[in-house]
Swiss-Prot record:
Residues 234-246 have a biased composition (Low complexity). This is Large ribosomal subunit protein uL3. PROSITE patterns: RIBOSOMAL_L3. Part of the 50S ribosomal subunit. Forms a cluster with proteins L14 and L19. It comes from Methylorubrum populi (strain ATCC BAA-705 / NCIMB 13946 / BJ001). Keywords: Methylation, Ribonucleoprotein, Ribosomal protein, RNA-binding, rRNA-binding. One of its GO terms (cellular component) is cytosolic large ribosomal subunit. One of its GO terms (biological process) is translation.
Length: 246
């Protein structure tokens, strides 16, 4: 089980296939997604990675968190998240996960906070049908109707679908296909819509309901100390020693 990443939703656009068909995609951008800490079975009871993105102002970071960032030798991060991983998928602390951590064609699950829409009625919030347009109905065409009956049950049950605040909920959309990646600009293009507003934080991880492709990088694709991850780069051959003329 590999780590996920935190990305920022840029917006939607479309890309064209070789057959000329257009595919609507959501553009997600990774902004220096670095591993901040490890969670181990011995110390924490589970195995996970804590990753962070964005650059936070030092004045907005608590003294305790400054110390943790200093130990990891990374700049203070604006957004943090934990991802459960297997022990063989731990990425070194301080490494930066890149966009080619995911490959085109694989499926991912994305998690975000939905757009807030304020107070909404039953028809918009729960897709109620409303009352009739005529035949004795006046004023209350979009009302939800009776909620509690008379003597039986004589009350409105808890969790009854009623008008109220709509949006600003944590939602996960599963099985979105990765159409394209751009490691140089840190972009991931996924097919379809992603919950949340443009500029919102999105968590992207491998799909839990789809089989992971055999050619995905393990434990992941990352840069360590300004270079690509050791697990993904072959050692460069040594240059032959030059002989000096006597």
């Amino acid at each position: 089980m590999r780590s996920g990443v935190i990305a920022r939703k840029v917006g939607m656009t479309r890309v064209f296939t070789d057959a000329g068909e257009h595919v609507p995609v959501t553009v997600l951008q990774i902004d220096q997604c670095q591993v901040v800490a490890h969670r181990t079975t011995e110390k924490d009871g589970y195995v996970a990675l804590q990753v962070g993105v964005g650059k936070a102002k030092v004045k907005n970071v608590s003294q305790a968190e400054r110390g943790r960032f200093a130990v990891a030798k990374v700049e203070p991060k604006k957004k943090l998240a934990e991802f459960r991983v297997s022990e063989d998928a731990l990425i070194p602390v301080g490494a930066e996960i890149t966009a080619d951590h995911f490959i085109p064609g694989q499926f991912v699950d994305v998690t975000g906070t939905t757009t807030g829409k304020g107070f909404a009625g039953g028809m918009k919030r729960w897709n109620f049908g409303g009352l009739r347009a005529t035949h004795g109905v006046s004023i209350s065409h979009r009302s939800i109707g009776s909620t509690g009956g008379r003597q039986d049950p004589g009350k409105t049950f808890k969790n009854k679908k009623m008008p109220g605040h709509l949006g600003v909920e944590r939602v996960t959309t599963q099985n979105l296909k990765v159409v394209r990646t751009d490691p140089e600009r840190g972009l991931i293009l996924v097919e379809g819509a992603v919950p949340g507003v443009a500029g919102g934080w999105i968590q992207v991880r491998d799909s839990v309901k789809r089989k992971l492709p055999a050619d995905v990088p393990l434990p992941g694709k990352f840069r360590e100390n300004g270079s690509a991850g050791a697990s993904q780069v072959e050692a460069a051959p040594e240059a032959p020693a030059s002989e000096e003329n006597a």
